[in-house]
């Protein structure tokens, strides 16, 4: 159903913070500032010229909104309760969405770790710690470059910390304790990453999936996204390409079985083995069951533009029917 001229967007790039909250959630002013800055990079790619992006602060101030957006389809970066409430507040009709607990399950890092566990030959093992005793036992193991500890939820470099092998320091113990109160930790060896990959996709209601061409991703040393570009077939080995395609299909099946449909992306990378040896593919670092910063670039039919608006129109043009649970 697409009688309206555009879509209404909530670009809640702080979604993982909301998913990790055990009670009511409100972003800090610092986080609001980051979201405000980063979402500008989605204008003209994910967000079309006729679309309207909702600004929560403007709505809270009572600033007038275009009357024409009432009844328009509403999309969110991630359809969390706050995002859906904001869409409904202005009269937009949210596109069919999963429930909160499902979003938490499929975006939590242990979900990705379980899917990866049997399909990463040659790469390292990820460990899940649910209490401090488990975490300390894992961190005490020898690791050439230390350990990367990830909280249950995190994005843009947030919710992770590099720790040396052995007994953590006082401030590190405080961070571990605070992190465990939020949920289990994923602990993995710190590795030297040679090249990062992403695959974007859309899993349909019937479980079928549309997968993008391979893309190369650049992030900061802290894991925050910088940019993504489509890569030519000769810039990735056939083995890596096939492994990433297979992993994306595997993730799509798992998401569909769990009850999710819509956009998602996976992160992967090729890293060096210990002692500076050969490189090996880690086919699944993260699952983002939502839109991503590179979804438009990856899914665009014309890679020169990085605009996936036509593709998004086709994929989201199903009848708008809200789920009842």
Say what each PLM segment does.
Residues 2-11, 16-36, 40-44:
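N-terminal-proximal low-complexity accessory segments that begin disordered
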Residues 32-48, 53-137, 141, 154-155:
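Conserved N-proximal alpha/beta basic substrate-recognition cap immediately N-terminal to
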Residues 122, 146-149, 164-192, 252-255:
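Conserved ATP-binding module of the ATP-grasp superfamily
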Residues 125-128, 146-172, 195-198, 221-236:
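Glycine-rich phosphate-binding loop of ATP-grasp-fold ATP-dependent ligases
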Residues 148, 284-285:
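Short hydrophobic beta-strand that contains or immediately precedes a catalytic carboxylate
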Residues 171-222, 269-284:
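Phosphate-binding site of ATP-dependent enzymes
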Residues 223-279, 318, 323-324:
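A long amphipathic alpha-helix within ATP-dependent nucleotide-binding catalytic cores
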Residues 238-242, 278-281, 289-325:
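C-terminal active-site "lid" helix and adjoining low-complexity regulatory extension at the edge
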